[in-house]
Amino acid sequence: MLFKQQVWLRQKLLVLGSLAVGSLLYLVARVGSLDRLQPICPVESRFGGAHNQAELPLRALQFKRGLLHEFRKGNSSKEQVHLHDLVQQLPKAIIIGVRKGGTRALLEMLNLHPAVVKASQEIHFFDNDENYAKGIEWYRKKMPFSYPQQITIEKSPAYFITEEVPERIYKMNSSIKLLIIVREPTTRAISDYTQVLEGKERKNKTYYKFEKLAIDPNTCEVNTKYKAVRTSIYTKHLERWLKYFPIEQFHIVDGDRLITEPLPELQLVEKFLNLPPRISQYNLYFNATRGFYCLRFNIIFNKCLAGSKGRIHPEVDPSVITKLRKFFHPFNQKFYQITGRTLNWP
């Protein structure tokens, strides 16, 4: 009798150990790095009391497991999810830009979908010669673990404006899907400036005012040599990409609308990626303190983007804003024509 109990106990410990390892591997594969997200704490349960922050990743894991099961339930009942199915896949979709257009927000929101797995950091494989020289296998090993049915997505906004990138991505996968999130060009340029300004101030360095950078003092015209201005000429960059990819492989996300009405934009992306609709209004809630939408995984696990998001922009001379919008207008019209999406920017 004692021998049977010992055997039973060893078997039970083996099963529990396997479950613990499995949970850890799945957590790494699906939840990924939380470095750019900040938990809302304390999180109150509907049953009362605040949950320990250390419990939150496990609760999120349990919720996402349920979503993954829902996504896979159309398969044969004989098919099971096994840990050995986990692989590091090359991305099937890439958010290629635009810087300060909302790339991080888009990636984190898409990660709500059970069929999406995100690369937690910007890889900078295609825009960095040193990284690119390491080869495609190095790039693949930078990807998170996922199941074959899932889509791995990475984002590196520098891809959009870097000349060599379209050809390099084409050589990897000529049928890849490309996401471009854009904002009103002048607003985006000011946001770009604001991020650089904040970095200078942290180092106690002085920096020119936006007006002096955006307007050429010699000609009083828009300074197209200023990177923040050049980046906002979306059509110039897109034309370079269209030499390698048809327009059907691009999806334009309205970054301004993603801030105010994220769900319709996310539903369009789901359709573009041929994903079943899984993201709902339940997954998104407006945080009045931060002034933008945050993510809800379940009733106790909520996340907001890091505090660096939603920076307050400096006041800019209205005449400069008018001049910039007049400058961008013809480029915007061409962008609408090429993409088939009118964004009604001023």
Curated annotation (Swiss-Prot):
Residue ranges crossing the lipid bilayer per the database entry: 13-32
Topology versus the membrane: Single-pass type II membrane protein
Documented EC number(s): 2.8.2.23
Superkingdom of this protein's organism: Eukaryota
GO biological process: heparan sulfate proteoglycan biosynthetic process; negative regulation of coagulation; regulation of viral entry into host cell
SUPFAM superfamilies named among the record's database cross-references: P-loop containing nucleoside triphosphate hydrolases
Stretches assigned to the Lumenal side: 33-346
Alphabetical UniProt keywords: Disulfide bond, Glycoprotein, Golgi apparatus, Membrane, Signal-anchor, Transferase, Transmembrane, Transmembrane helix
GO molecular function: [heparan sulfate]-glucosamine 3-sulfotransferase activity
Disulfide linkage: C294-C304
Sites where a glycan is attached: N75, N173, N204, N287
Catalysed reactions, as listed in the record: alpha-D-glucosaminyl-[heparan sulfate](n) + 3'-phosphoadenylyl sulfate = 3-sulfo-alpha-D-glucosaminyl-[heparan sulfate](n) + adenosine 3',5'-bisphosphate + H(+)
Binding positions (3'-phosphoadenylyl sulfate): K100, G101, G102, T103, R104, R183, S191, Y293, K309, G310, R311, I312, H313
GO CC, alphabetical: Golgi membrane
Residues in compartment: Cytoplasmic: 1-12
Binding sites annotated in the UniProt record for substrate: E122, I123, H124, F125, F126, D127, N128, K155, S156, P157, A158, Y226, K227
Subcellular location: Golgi apparatus membrane
Function according to Swiss-Prot or TrEMBL: Sulfotransferase that utilizes 3'-phospho-5'-adenylyl sulfate (PAPS) to catalyze the transfer of a sulfo group to position 3 of glucosamine residues in heparan. Catalyzes the rate limiting step in the biosynthesis of heparan sulfate (HSact). This modification is a crucial step in the biosynthesis of anticoagulant heparan sulfate as it completes the structure of the antithrombin pentasaccharide binding site. Also generates GlcUA-GlcNS or IdoUA-GlcNS and IdoUA2S-GlcNH2.
Family: Belongs to the sulfotransferase 1 family.
Protein name (database record): Heparan sulfate glucosamine 3-O-sulfotransferase 5
Origin species: Mus musculus
